[in-house]
Regions:
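C-terminal motif of bacterial Sec signal peptides marking the signal peptidase cleavage site
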Residues: 13-17
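Long, terminal "pre-/pro-" and other extracytoplasmic accessory regions
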Residues: 4-5, 18-294
Length: 294
């Protein structure tokens, strides 16, 4: 009861800022995820802003969680033992993780700590192999699963965040992000489909409650983009210190709501360094930036 009261109070406070009629402006730009790739600048992640969740191997007593849960997934019942607590950096994202071993593998499923819903599950099979089903055929299965899902809001396909697991785990991943007031938001649904038999082997909608209580989003896109461009240009200059020309591209932007209820925009920025006269055929590093809004 106390937990729900606290959530309602936070939502009321946050609604006055994130969901008001005023247009939010950028407060500052921070590095929110470490640089990935061949080069780095030595820049450090702001400790106050983290976009990476963490797992804690707590006992059910320590986490005040049920020691076992029975859920129905794809028409079949599974009973799992409490395995860990996942602490999300985003609003309403904390989950309890349960583990269920069965004959051909292991199922992990996650229960939302606020609403008690299954928001994430994945199967780990002992003999997962790449099958003959194509990306397009598996995509049709994922699209159908999305239509049947009981989720609120409008979601569209987003290949930018997809990963190809066909060779390593025998499945294709499909990502759908939510649109609110014309903005892409960091509420994504991920569905992975086996290329061997068309089974859904992973399903994630862990951030579906991120924007509960918010009816309207309004922020100054131009000012946010300019702030990110300034940061990225400075970052590129540092990467060019070794004498190699560097270019950057803002690849994607998603409005997000952090655990404390504050709002901002996540930007994916890619960098490409020239090895000589010609640029490489792909970007060789990326960072995530977070623009705090006020």
């Amino acid at each position: 009861m106390k937990r729900f009261f606290a959530i309602a109070l936070i939502a009321l406070i946050v609604f006055s800022s994130c969901g008001s009629n005023s247009v939010m402006e950028p407060k500052r730009v921070v590095l929110a995820d470490t640089a990935q790739g061949e080069y780095g600048t030595g820049a450090e992640i702001d400790p106050a802003i983290s976009l990476v969740g963490s797992r804690q191997l707590l006992s059910p007593e320590q986490s005040e969680s049920e020691p076992a849960k029975t859920v129905t997934i794809q028409g079949k019942e599974y009973t799992g033992k409490h395995h860990s607590v996942y602490l999300s950096p985003f609003y309403n994202g904390d989950c309890d993780e349960y583990k269920c071993d069965f004959e051909s593998g292991t199922l992990y499923f996650f229960i939302d700590r606020t609403y008690g819903e299954v928001v994430y599950y994945y199967f780990m099979y002992n003999d997962a192999t790449k099958g003959e089903m194509t990306y397009e055929a598996c995509r049709n299965i994922a699209d159908s699963a999305l239509k049947e899902a009981n989720v609120s809001g409008e979601y569209i396909h987003d290949s930018f965040n997809e990963r190809d697991y066909a060779d390593s785990f025998g499945c294709y991943e499909y990502v759908y992000y939510r649109i609110m007031d014309g903005f892409a938001v960091f509420d994504m649904i991920k569905i992975s489909v086996s290329s061997e038999n068309g089974q859904i082997v992973r399903y994630i909608l862990a951030d579906n409650h991120m924007f509960d209580g918010i009816e309207r989003i309004s922020y100054d896109e131009a000012s946010c983009k300019k702030a990110v461009e300034d940061y990225a240009a400075d970052y590129a200059d540092k990467l060019s210190a070794n004498g190699k020309k560097c270019e950057y591209e803002i690849a994607a932007a998603y409005f997000a709501r952090l655990k404390d209820g504050s709002c901002g925009v996540i930007y994916y920025v890619y960098f490409k360094q020239y090895a000589g006269a010609e640029a490489p055929d792909r970007y060789n590093m990326a960072i995530k930036l977070f623009v705090e809004l006020e």
